Each structure stands twice: as structure tokens, then as C-alpha cells.
Amino acid sequence: MAVPVEEAIAALSTFSLEDEQPEVQGPAVMVSAERAATDSPIEYSDVAAYRLSLSEDTKALNQLNTLIQEGKEMASILYTYRSCVKALPQLPESMKHSQADLYLETYQVLDLEMSRLREIQRWQSSASAKLAADMQRFSRPERRINGPTVTHLWSMLKLLDVLVQLDHLKNAKASIPNDFSWYKRTFTQVSAQWQDTDTMREELDDLQIFLSTRWAILLNLHVEMFRVNNVEDILQVLIVFIVESLELDFALLFPERYILLRVLPVLVVLATPSEKDTEALYKRVKLNRLINIFKNDPVIPAFPDLHLSPAAILKELSVYFQKFSSQTRLLTLPAPHELPPREALEYQRHYLIVNHIGALRAEHDDFTIRFASSMNQLLLLKSNDGAYTEWCREVKGNMYDMVVEGFQLLSRWTARIWEQCAWKFSRPCRDAGETPEASGSYSDYEKVVRFNYTAEERKALVELVGYIKSVGSMLQRCDTLVADALWETIHAEVQDFVQNTLATMLRTTFRKKKDLSRILSDMRTLSADWMANTRPEHEMPSSQHGNDESRGNFFYPRPVAPTAAQVHCLQFLIYEVVSGGNLRRPGGFFGNNGSEIPVNDLKQLETFFYKLSFFLHILDYSASIGILTDLGFLWFREFYLESSRVIQFPIECSLPWMLIDYILEAQNSGLLESVLLPFDIYNDSAQQALVVLRQRFLYDEIEAEVDHGFDIFVSRLSESIFTYYKSWSASELLDPSFLFALDNGEKFSIQPVRFTALFKMTKVKILGRTINLRSLIAQRMNRIFRENLEFLFDRFESQDLCAVVELEKLIDILKHSHELLSQDLSIDPFSLMLNEMQENISLVSFSSRLATQIWSEMQSDFLPNFILCNTTQRFVRSSKVPPTQKPSVPSAKPSFYCGTQDLNAAHQSFARLHSGFFGIPHLFSIVKLLGSRSLPWLIRALLDHISNKITTLEPMISGLQEALPKSIGLLSFDGGVTGCMKLIREQLNWGTKSELKSEVLRGIKEIGSVIYTMGLLDIVLREVDTKRFMQTAPWLGLIPGAEGQIVNAQDGESPLVNLLKSATSAVVSSPGCLNPAAFYTMSKQAEAADLLYKANMNGGSVLEYTLAFTSASLDKYCSKWSAPPKTGFVDITTSKDFYRIYGGLQIGYLEEITAPQSAQHEVLGDSIAWGGCTIIYLLGQQLHFELFDFSYQVLNVSEVETVSASHTHRNPQIHQGWEGLLEGMKKARRLNNHVFSMLKARCPLEDKTACAIKQSGAPLPRVRFENTVSAFETLPQKGTVG
């Protein structure tokens, strides 16, 4: 079934082709099928149809316009001319025989360039002659026209401006005469064998005179103009026109104003060839008016990096025009570099944008608000077909006024940038060497650009560039929307004037003046649109009463604009009516001196005359916007490039890049969204290089700089983004109590920066290319995050295990930064990055880089060099162990830590709290960092370390066993403590095995450190599991029972499964469900998750498994370390059991640590007790140890001695000399009891291994655990044995 066209169009109108990309770039060329405001042709081909005796004027006008276009091309050639001599190769001595060939090649290259200069010479001669002839045509008495039209005056001035610029460029380009001298030298060499070279030599001499003579073009023009001495009148007319236009702001756009300013000093010199002509000129234009104009604009923009000075031009031309040298008042005007300091300061206040940025900002804000309001009214009007006519006219007229105001604003703003640049070029930085960026040597271009703009001036320039580009883009986007409104408004203005205003004048003021009435009638004839007085029948009022005049006031709106020829003719006719064509008429164009026209009518004519001038700019809408927003001149530096003798300046000297660099450095959130606008300057300069200057090499240089600059820009922008989000994350993760306790906590807060607009930029237009900035930033972010993780791991690998808390904190900050950034940017998942950096991508890889490093640190540094404090539950580094050699800590930018220096210091203060010990906080960090994937691998590595240590200790303990006597009995109470200690020393004959004793103690200490670490890890894991259980229990329907056990809250399925099943059934039953299989899959996944979480509720104990594993590892040495008694009863004299060895080691160790200046305890710590007591307990020797340990027996003897002494009243100093040792024994006994009590609680032998000794003394067989040293098995559930 076919869809009706109306419905199809309505459906298509609901689609939007616009994306969400913000407008942070300047206007771009658009392709549109709608009517645009640029459809008006700018030409004068239809002037002849109006029969106004303007055919001769129009012919000359077209000729001048052709010359102007040709002259601009000549100026482009001169401006972009670069020295060929610089590129000439220097022949070595060995190739001197090829000198002739080099001369020929050089001549051929230079001849091409010289041919262009000869073409410029010929063209300027022809153009000067044609301009002079055109001026003389208006000075002939037989001419039929009273004076040139305004359009003609502008064409004369534009051509004269082109000639002045050509002369200025020829004077400024030092490479041209240099190349010419080489050209002449090579010509002399290669033309020796040529015939008939006289003509070529004459041309060469003429070209040499032309190039070497300053102001040769102007002198030639002067000669051409005064071949007939009657052009003074037209020169005075031009001067009067310029002065009035400048004083009355008749020059609507800034390029026109600069043309007038550049031409005026030259015209003043040309118009004063004699005293009589000078007096005549000053009668029409007072000298003070000229001086004021020259003083108001001491520098005039001419080229991107060249400026003109009226005072300098007048002084220089006075040398060539002797009659003008008497004009002392004009010649005493100071040039820019001659200004007194006070005047220079005043001019600086005027020229520098930073002094006016507040007013400019207010203008921009006010205009954008009012323009948006006018656009809304226009869109409302377009959506309302039945709007009444008066309101339509008002809305469209208001839109026209806003466009005119926008053009004027753009003109003023762009002119400010031109003038500031010209002022900067005229006033180079004198103290460039004192700036921070300045090196030992710097070029002139660096003086006028790089070191000549302060930070505030750069900021103001960035703002103004943003205003120009944003307003230009706003005007460009609405081109097709406002076209009809602009054309209708212009049409209404013209028709109202010619049909109503002129009709009134014809009936009143000019009724009896036949000549003027004829002119007014001609104006009506060539411009009136009589068809506009009719309306469609359905719009005609029901009754039409009244006279013809009232009906003539209404015009049906038509988007038909006047042509350029009509505007040209209307301006001419108005001028004829007002001035009568009298060139010498005082009072200017619209002065009322001697005029018979009433003031009111004269004012109406003047107003419409000025409106006509702007009509052409409005009709040429896009071209006008392009001119007014073109800032490409900020890049060009041809003059300074030539004078500096370098191939190209570094990017740091480029003004567009300086603006980008300032935005990135300043971190001003208000300017950051404008960071792409300076790239529009590159777009403008590239367009100018290709279209205006037509030089591909300039475009290539711009492209190279843009490619290099954009890479730097993306890199630095990405770093700024990363730093901001890193600082934001670090600020949020700071302890609130820490911030509350500070008086200056605000320095840790981060001011918001708006990167969102840049994140949405998927189509950045640079040099005709479209770049996805969002994608580039995402790629850089992925790279920076990986580099940051790599740095954090490298940093951790160069520190000890205590730095794991800091590592976890820094990774948390980085992860939170990733979360914040992921809200605005699509980047790789953080878990993926972390796994990549940990080299843990494979599904069967469990030993991650971090786990390997932690185990390496434990094995090489932590276990040997850290000692345990059982009271604080912390390991601290032994001060008596030499520090382990580690690689130096890598340094990095603050952004790789916490973002800013202040935040780095704050987080470092927290990190230092955990840098001096290893304990529960560190294990929390390890559990979080390793996760459930790598933590079991680390646990297994620690268990294997216990097994390996036991294996290593076995021969050492055997050596100690061999040194003991075969039988060791109980200590006698008769000898007291002293006797006991003497007997113990005799029995423990290990004097020759001191090194062996130390190795055994260190081995037992490492075993104890591992076991204690496992105990702490068990505490941490239980807390983590409890927290996870509290989060998942409500979803699984689990609640605590009456006796503390976990029970299901309800029979059947868990709340999670029920929720997803009900949601699935509800969604699938809906007719709009397109993919029910996905919801069924989610429901099945919920059931699987329910089973997995419930199965994982009763996790085993790491400590219990460690003890069971250690017990299994001891099984193979049980026969050696715990020999069963031969009699079947407890043997109290055995000396080979482990508890005997450990008892001997312990009392020797206690003697050492209690000795004066001993540091043995700082080497072993409390881990020795955990290792020894655990082995004793698991061997079933706890009772033996408590009964027969040497230190325990000494304490018993000491207690008996103390009691006996108290009963017999003997010397209380009975234990003198043994107090320290006895106190150490008591502490050791308390620590041993604590260890045994913990072991009984976590690994009761009656449950797992049964009791090794009955009260009767009969031994029982042990339950053996299978030892799997080299393979990892799942931790056993609580209560199970293997």
C-alpha cells in the first residue's frame, strides 16, 4: 500500500539530522537546498537598462574592479615571495668545473621569479595610467555626469590602496633586490654566448630601477595623474569623502575603514603639488581634521605581519615630493616608535583588548540573548501561517536589525584584533630576555609575538576570538532561516522609500523643480515594485474605503531583493539630488550649506543612502560573515620569516598555538570549551593560503604545524583531563574527619571543569578534515590509565611489603577516577586494564604480577627481616638486619599519584601511618588487590614455604639432637636457680653449633611468621565474608535462627529468583516484548547465582587449613622428632624429641635477649614462640613441653626458692643476677600459653588428630593428613579431615 506524499513528508520532518555535538568551533561551509541569503549577484551588468547616462561610469567601474582583483593577486605574489638565493647550493672545490652549469640552473630558477616581478612592473604601470585617466575623465569640462558615484569613489580608493600596498611590500621585501642581484650576475654569465641581448638588458635595467627605487609605484602614479594638471578636484573629493566617512563611521566594515586610513596620507601628499592646491584642500578639509585622524590611528593594519604608519608615510614621501616638505605640522607627527611614553601608554590602553574585554563581554552576552529571542519569534512566525501582516513585518524587521548589528559587532571585534596585532608589531617587547621562556637568543618575531603578550592579554584575545567565532557561527547557521526575512525587509525598505517617501517629496518639495523631479521619478522607475501593492483575494479586506494614498502604503511582502546595479543607481541619483554633482560643494555629501532641500527631506535621503550601503553586505551574507570572522592573519609571518633567516619558526612562536597553550596551562573552566577555537585560526589561514594567496607551500607549512600542534594538544588535553579526574577522585576519597579538622580544608577541594563539551566533539573540522576528538581522547585515556597502573606497580616493586596499603589507596583513587570519567567517555573497563597490567588475562592464570611480587617480598624480605609484636599484632622491620637492596623508586608527575601536590601530601600523610609496620590493614589491602583469583595462589605459596622450611630444618635439628646427651632428667631443686642453670649449660652442649642454632631459630621464626600471618588473614577474610554475607543474605532469603544458625526465611525459592521470575513472566506476557529468550536466560542465571552463593556460605578457615597442612607436613618427621616411648609410658628422660630441642633453644635464646646490650629479640621477635609452640602442639608434645621444658623447670625452682626463703627469712636477694632471665622466662611462658590456647581453640587435637597421650600415659596413633606440597587443593570445609 502506497504511503501518501504528505504523510511521508510529515514522517521525515520528525527526524533530526543534527547531533548533540556542542558548537565550540567557528562557522563552516554548509551545503543546503534551501534558499540562502547569499543568492544575490554582485554585478553591474543591468545598469545600461535603466538609461541613466551611467554606461560610461559602469564601464570604468568594471575596469577598476578588474584591476583591483589583479592587483590583489600581485600583492599576494609579493607578500609570499621568499628568497631563492637562500636555497642555492654551495659547490665544493672538487666541483668548481661545474660552475657554469650551476649558473645556468640558477638563472632558469630566478628567471621564473623575475618574470613575475616584471609582470608586476608592467601591471602597476598600466594600472596607474588607467586610474589617472579615470580621474581625469571626471575633471573634463565636457563630461555629461556631475561627479563620480559613491561606488566609483570606492573603486578608485580600493585600486589606489592596492598600489600603495604593492609599493609598501616592494620596499619591505629585502630578499627581492638580493635575488635580483644574483639574477643579474647569472644573466651576465650565461648571456655571454647569446646574441641580441640589448632588449633583455634594457628590461633588466628597468626592472632594477623599479625594484631599487622606493615608492616607485606611487611616483609613477603621480607622473601619470599630472600629465594633465586638472585632477586636483577629484583628489580633493576623494579626501573629503575619506574624512567624512571616517568621522561619520560611513565605512561600515573594518576592511573599508582600513582602506580609507591607508590611502588618506598618500592622497594628502598627491593633492598638494603646489601652495595653491594646498590652500584649496585646507579650505575644504581643515588641517586639524587630518591631524586628528592621523593621531587617532598611529598604526594601520596592512598585512598580517606588516603595518603602516601615516606619520612614517608622510615623512618618507616628503623626500620625494618637495612641495609637501613644507607641511611641518603633518611631518612632525610622531611615528609609533617615536611616541613619548605617556602617549604610548594612552595608545596602549586603547589598542589592547584586555582593557576593553569587560565591555566586549557585555556586548556579546546582550547580543546573543536578543538574537536568540528574535530567532524564536521568527520560528514562531514560520509555524503560524495566519499571522497578521504588521506583526510579520515587525518580526522580520527586528531580525534584519539584529543581523545588521551582528555584522557591526563582528566588524568592531575583528578590527580590535587587527589593531592590537598592528600595535604589537610596532612596539616589540624590549625586555624579552627577562621572560621565563626566553633563551639565550631570540628572533625579532619572538619579540613581537611570543614575548609581547602577557597572560591576561592572551586570555582576553582567546575570549574575543571565541566571541567572534561563536557569533559568526550563530549567524551562519541561521542563513537559510533568515534569508526570506532579510530579503523581504530590504524589499519593504526600498519600496516604502520609492513609493511613499518619494511620492510625498514629489507632491511637496520638488513639485516645481523639474530637474530634481525627473531624478526622483527615475528612482521610482528603476526600483518600484508595483506588483507588491496587490494581495491575494482571500487576504483582501471586506471593504476598501479611502483614498489611493492610503492603499499605496501597504506592500505585500516579497523576498525579492534589489540588485547591486539598482543600489548603485539609487545611490548615484540620491547624490545627484543632494549635491547637484558639484565637486567643490562645501559641507560634504549631506551638508545643508546652500541647499534648497528641507532638513527633514535631507535627513530622509541621508538615512536611506546609508541603508543602501549596507544592503549589499546583507545580501552577500555568507561572504560578509567569512570576511568578518576571518582571523587567519594571526598565523602569517612572512616578513619576519625573511628577516630572521630561518626556514620556519617553532610552534611556540605561533600565536594560534600560544592561545591553545594558554588555555591548557591556565585550566580556566570558562575558557576550556573555547580550546578548539584557535584551530579555526589555522582553518582561516589555510583558506587564505589556498584561495587568496594561492600558495601551496604556505598551506603545507600550516598543515605541518596543525598536525604537530594537534598531536600535542590531544596529549596535553588528555593529561589535563586525567589530572582533573584524578584530583576529583582523590578529593572525594579523603577522610571527612581529616578535612573537618583542618582550617584550610578548601585547598583539597577541586573546582569543577567543564570537559563535557569536548567529550561530545566527534566532528572537529580542521583543514577540511573531520576528526573524532572523543575517540582520540578515549584512546589517550586508555593509554594513560595503563601507564599509571604500570607506574604504581613499578613503584610498589621498588618498596617493601608495607607499601601495599598505599598501593591499594592509589589504585582505589585511579579506579574511582575511571568511574567518574566513564560517565562521560567510553573507555576500557578498569578490570580489564588491571588484569592486563597484572599479566593475568588467561583464564588459567592465577599467579598475577602483584601476587608474585607480594610473595617475592614475603620470601626475600618480610619473613627473614620482619619481627612480630604479639601485643600489637604487627610485624616491624628489624633494626639489626641490613636493609634489602631495592631498585630506586621511579618518579612521575603528580597526576600519577593523586593529581595535585596538596592532595599528594594529604594522601602521603595517610600512607606514612602504615609504612612502618605490617598488619591487618595490609592484609585487607592484599585481599582486596588479589581478589579470589590470586589470593589462593599466595596462600598455597605460603603453605609450601612452611613445608619447605620444615624440610630444611630437619637435618639441622638432627645435628642439634646429636649434640645432646642421651638422657636428660628433671632438674634438682637442691641447687636452686644457679645450680639449675649450671646443669642446663652442661647438658646443652651446643657451643660448637652456634651457627646451626641461629639457622634453626630463624627457620622456626619464619614458620611462626607465616602461621601468625595466616591467623591475621583468617580474621580479615572472615570480616570480608561476613560483610558479603550481610549484603547477599536478604536476596537469598537467609535469616539467623533461634540458636544462631542460618535458616531460610521461607520455603521454596529465594527472593532473588522469585523477583526475576515474576519480572520475566510480566515482560514476556506483554505483546511488545521482542526478545523473550533474553528474559528467560536472566531467570535461569538468577537460579544459578542463588545456588553458587548458598554453596559458598560456609567457607573454611584459612588458619585451620594452615594448621592441618603444617601437621601433614610434620608427619614424615614425626618418628624423628617425636619418638614413641619404648615402655608405652611417658619417658621423662628423653632428649631427642622436638620439645627438648626447642626448650634448649628457647632458654639459650632467653639468656641472650636478657643479656646487657643484647639485640637478639630485635632479630627474632615473638614469631619464634608461634613457630615452636605450633610444631610442639601439632606433634602432640604440648604436655611434655609444659612439664619438662628447661625454662619452665627453672621457674618452678625459682618459685620454690622464693617460698622457702620467705619461710626461713633468708636473704631476699636470693635470685640476684637472674632477675632479667626469670622475667624473660615468665614472659615466654605467658606467650607460649597464649599460643597453645589459640591452637586448642582453632585446631583441637581431640577433634582432628585425637590426643597423643592419655592420662594413663599410653600413646594413641595420630590421624595423618595427606601432604600435597606441589599442588593446590580446595580448602577443606570446617570440621572435615583428610
From Swiss-Prot:
InterPro entries: CYRIA/CYRIB_Rac1-bd (IPR009828), Cytoplasmic_FMR1-int (IPR008081). It comes from the Eukaryota. GO terms for cellular component: SCAR complex. Pfam families: CYRIA-B_Rac1-bd, FragX_IP. GO terms for biological process: actin cytoskeleton organization; actin nucleation; regulation of actin filament polymerization; trichome morphogenesis. One of its GO terms (molecular function) is small GTPase binding. Expressed in roots, root hairs, hypocotyls, cotyledons, stems, leaves, trichomes and flowers. Binds NAP1 and ROP2, but not ROP8. Involved in regulation of actin and microtubule organization. Part of a WAVE complex that activates the ARP2/3 complex. Interacts with the active form of RHO-family GTPases. PANTHER family: CYTOPLASMIC FMR1-INTERACTING PROTEIN-RELATED. This is Protein PIR. The lineage of its organism: Eukaryota, Viridiplantae, Streptophyta, Embryophyta, Tracheophyta.
